[in-house]
């Protein structure tokens, strides 16, 4: 029997995408800084002008799953990191957004076979968000580390089983000009 476990030895070989929500940008920019620090320390060049990491900025967390899915369907990425912050307010809006973002990111990963790190903070107040984005620790680092480990793990499994990631559009038909690459 085989034992599969991700490592960080060959992280410099990975191609990654990071999707970041602009809403609550004070928090999201700190998460991004932690993410980039982790990538750099593991041999990945996080420079937006480089060839290893692409960045997609979206209006808010609710838009993250759609863009993550579109990026995953290109087949260019070993993993995708999603960063955002949903902070509870006085209305049920928080519950809807937090739930749908989590479901959308999970569904995208399962449907495409591409590891997607869920780095969307869901917190009760700004103080909690800031604590998780740098005051006490920066979870952006953890989300990047998770993506690297999962990319490595999926490469191990695929190299052993011969499976390739799906590059189909499971929820809707592909547009006629979609090349799938």
UniProtKB/Swiss-Prot annotation:
Catalytic reaction annotation: (2S)-2-hydroxy-3-oxobutyl phosphate + 5-amino-6-(D-ribitylamino)uracil = 6,7-dimethyl-8-(1-D-ribityl)lumazine + phosphate + 2 H2O + H(+)
Annotated binding of (2S)-2-hydroxy-3-oxobutyl phosphate, by residue: 90-91, 132
Lineage of the organism: Bacteria, Bacillati, Cyanobacteriota, Cyanophyceae, Synechococcales
Job of this protein: Catalyzes the formation of 6,7-dimethyl-8-ribityllumazine by condensation of 5-amino-6-(D-ribitylamino)uracil with 3,4-dihydroxy-2-butanone 4-phosphate. This is the penultimate step in the biosynthesis of riboflavin.
Gene Ontology biological-process entries: riboflavin biosynthetic process
Descriptive protein name: 6,7-dimethyl-8-ribityllumazine synthase
Pfam family, one: DMRL_synthase
Active-site residues (renumbered): 93
EC annotation from Swiss-Prot or TrEMBL: 2.5.1.78
Similarity remark: Belongs to the DMRL synthase family.
Domain of life according to the entry: Bacteria
Pathway per the UniProt entry: Cofactor biosynthesis; riboflavin biosynthesis; riboflavin from 2-hydroxy-3-oxobutyl phosphate and 5-amino-6-(D-ribitylamino)uracil: step 1/2
GO CC, any one term: riboflavin synthase complex
GO molecular function, a single term: 6,7-dimethyl-8-ribityllumazine synthase activity
Sequence positions that bind 5-amino-6-(D-ribitylamino)uracil: 23, 61-63, 85-87, 118
Keywords annotated in UniProt: Riboflavin biosynthesis, Transferase
């Amino acid at each position: 029997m085989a034992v599969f476990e991700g490592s960080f030895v060959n992280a410099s070989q990975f191609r990654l995408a990071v999707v970041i929500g602009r809403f609550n940008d004070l928090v999201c920019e700190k998460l991004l800084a932690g993410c980039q620090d982790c990538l750099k320390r593991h041999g990945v060049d996080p420079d937006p002008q480089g060839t290893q990491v692409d960045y997609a900025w979206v209006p808010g967390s609710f838009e993250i799953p759609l863009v993550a899915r579109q990026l995953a369907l290109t087949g260019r990425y070993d993993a995708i990191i999603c960063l955002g912050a949903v902070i509870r307010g006085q209305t049920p809006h928080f519950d809807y957004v937090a739930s749908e973002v989590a479901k959308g990111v999970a569904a995208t990963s399962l449907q495409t076979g591409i590891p997607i790190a869920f780095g969307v903070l869901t917190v009760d107040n700004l103080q909690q968000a800031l604590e998780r984005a740098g005051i006490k620790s920066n979870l952006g680092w953890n989300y990047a580390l998770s993506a690297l480990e999962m990319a490595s793990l999926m490469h191990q499994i695929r190299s052993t089983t011969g499976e390739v990631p799906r590059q189909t559009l499971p929820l809707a038909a592909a547009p006629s000009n979609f090349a799938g690459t």
